[in-house]
Amino acid sequence: MTNTTGKINLLGLTQPEMEQFFESIGEKRFRAGQVMKWIHHFGVDDFAAMTNVGKALREKLEASAEIRGPEVVSENISADGTRKWVVRVASGSCVETVYIPQNGRGTLCVSSQAGCALDCSFCSTGKQGFNSDLTSAEIIGQVWIANKSFGTVPAKIDRAITNVVMMGMGEPLLNFDNVVSAMQIMMDDLGYGISKRKVTLSTSGVVPMIDKLAEVIDVSLALSLHAPNDELRNQLVPINKKYPLDMLLAACKRYVAKLGEKRVLTIEYTLLKGVNDQPEHAEQMIALLADVPCKINLIPFNPFPFSGYERPSNNAIRRFQDLLHKAGHNVTVRTTRGDDIDAACGQLVGQVMDRTRRSERYIAVRQLGSEAQEPRAAANRN
């Protein structure tokens, strides 16, 4: 998977970057739109198949560029229709992409990193350690692979993929530039034309990057909350020690307010038996979210080996949901999908090569500080 050709991978370029590329090889900017449609609308990875592109330009493209997605290692289909792709990226690690069909829509859950540095105690991805950020081509390549698998082009109706959630392996905000570029392609009509309201980024709470996100792109935001107080969240989601709840929720409120249009924050809360599922936790959550425009998604824990956690009983789940409902919150309980192929929330593992030691997993968080990262060059998005 490593690019040893020196060619630029067009799969991960946004429209402005694609236009710059064509100018750099002495071509008109409009060629960007032609080629992007071939790549994203029709899943083409061979320049020779681009019939409205002249032979001379096709030869020039062959010499300087390529269209290269991640390598599909396996595809599994659950009894409930959920699909999971395991794909190998340039680092040699494998990451997972999940498609969930439900109620007339199709949601694609996309990974942003091979492994994860945040080490949330109830998440199987965190147990794998951290290997590498995915490039923008490797992120959008998951959408490209899934779209090709369904044999569809992104028409406005009857499309298989209607929603994309950055909720797969990794913390998206720790791979900021590549994730933003991939989401821009998802929403671009030359890409997949998905509505900004139907592209969702989920974060465990990298506060400086939440503020930066609001400056550069308009997508829906989800917060992996999982605990209603700092003491418990420090144990479950260790990044909370750096960005505690008051700081985190203030950033989320700023983000939602900046977008306007009656947008709300999605709160994700994994229910763990005897840990965060008691009535007092629901009451604390009600108080915590009193002034936060949000909807709440409760996620019963999906077991994985040696996790040390259990799924609450159905009665405990209903009790927790009812308490939140009575306080006026919009609350849903996520239906477990794809657990027979290990594709349920929190079960994504992949195969992370050269895993870092646990003590090293926080390097990215420690180095982040309060400064926004400088944009990376498009050449690093291969």
Swiss-Prot record:
<dbReference type="GO" id="GO:0000049">
    <property type="term" value="F:tRNA binding"/>
</dbReference>
<dbReference type="GO" id="GO:0070040">
    <property type="term" value="F:rRNA (adenine(2503)-C2-)-methyltransferase activity"/>
</dbReference>
<feature type="binding site">
    <location>
        <position position="120"/>
    </location>
    <ligand>
        <name>[4Fe-4S] cluster</name>
    </ligand>
</feature>
<feature type="disulfide bond" description="(transient)">
    <location>
        <begin position="109"/>
        <end position="345"/>
    </location>
</feature>
<keyword id="KW-0489">Methyltransferase</keyword>
<feature type="binding site">
    <location>
        <position position="123"/>
    </location>
    <ligand>
        <name>[4Fe-4S] cluster</name>
    </ligand>
</feature>
<keyword id="KW-0408">Iron</keyword>
<dbReference type="Pfam" id="PF21016">
    <property type="entry name" value="RlmN_N"/>
</dbReference>
<feature type="active site" description="Proton acceptor">
    <location>
        <position position="96"/>
    </location>
</feature>
<dbReference type="GO" id="GO:0070475">
    <property type="term" value="P:rRNA base methylation"/>
</dbReference>
<keyword id="KW-0479">Metal-binding</keyword>
<feature type="binding site">
    <location>
        <position position="302"/>
    </location>
    <ligand>
        <name>S-adenosyl-L-methionine</name>
    </ligand>
</feature>
<dbReference type="InterPro" id="IPR040072">
    <property type="entry name" value="Methyltransferase_A"/>
</dbReference>
<dbReference type="GO" id="GO:0051539">
    <property type="term" value="F:4 iron, 4 sulfur cluster binding"/>
</dbReference>
<keyword id="KW-0949">S-adenosyl-L-methionine</keyword>
<feature type="binding site">
    <location>
        <position position="116"/>
    </location>
    <ligand>
        <name>[4Fe-4S] cluster</name>
    </ligand>
</feature>
<feature type="binding site">
    <location>
        <position position="202"/>
    </location>
    <ligand>
        <name>S-adenosyl-L-methionine</name>
    </ligand>
</feature>
<dbReference type="GO" id="GO:0005737">
    <property type="term" value="C:cytoplasm"/>
</dbReference>
<keyword id="KW-0411">Iron-sulfur</keyword>
<dbReference type="GO" id="GO:0030488">
    <property type="term" value="P:tRNA methylation"/>
</dbReference>
<dbReference type="InterPro" id="IPR007197">
    <property type="entry name" value="rSAM"/>
</dbReference>
<feature type="binding site">
    <location>
        <begin position="224"/>
        <end position="226"/>
    </location>
    <ligand>
        <name>S-adenosyl-L-methionine</name>
    </ligand>
</feature>
<dbReference type="Pfam" id="PF04055">
    <property type="entry name" value="Radical_SAM"/>
</dbReference>
<comment type="similarity">
    <text>Belongs to the radical SAM superfamily. RlmN family.</text>
</comment>
<dbReference type="InterPro" id="IPR048641">
    <property type="entry name" value="RlmN_N"/>
</dbReference>
<dbReference type="InterPro" id="IPR013785">
    <property type="entry name" value="Aldolase_TIM"/>
</dbReference>
<dbReference type="InterPro" id="IPR004383">
    <property type="entry name" value="rRNA_lsu_MTrfase_RlmN/Cfr"/>
</dbReference>
<dbReference type="GO" id="GO:0019843">
    <property type="term" value="F:rRNA binding"/>
</dbReference>
<dbReference type="GO" id="GO:0046872">
    <property type="term" value="F:metal ion binding"/>
</dbReference>
<comment type="function">
    <text>Specifically methylates position 2 of adenine 2503 in 23S rRNA and position 2 of adenine 37 in tRNAs. m2A2503 modification seems to play a crucial role in the proofreading step occurring at the peptidyl transferase center and thus would serve to optimize ribosomal fidelity.</text>
</comment>
<keyword id="KW-0698">rRNA processing</keyword>
<protein>
    <recommendedName>
        <fullName>Dual-specificity RNA methyltransferase RlmN</fullName>
        <ecNumber>2.1.1.192</ecNumber>
    </recommendedName>
</protein>
<dbReference type="GO" id="GO:0002935">
    <property type="term" value="F:tRNA (adenine(37)-C2)-methyltransferase activity"/>
</dbReference>
<keyword id="KW-1015">Disulfide bond</keyword>
<feature type="active site" description="S-methylcysteine intermediate">
    <location>
        <position position="345"/>
    </location>
</feature>
<keyword id="KW-0819">tRNA processing</keyword>
<keyword id="KW-0808">Transferase</keyword>
<feature type="binding site">
    <location>
        <begin position="170"/>
        <end position="171"/>
    </location>
    <ligand>
        <name>S-adenosyl-L-methionine</name>
    </ligand>
</feature>
<feature type="domain" description="Radical SAM core">
    <location>
        <begin position="102"/>
        <end position="340"/>
    </location>
</feature>
<dbReference type="InterPro" id="IPR027492">
    <property type="entry name" value="RNA_MTrfase_RlmN"/>
</dbReference>
<keyword id="KW-0963">Cytoplasm</keyword>
<keyword id="KW-0004">4Fe-4S</keyword>
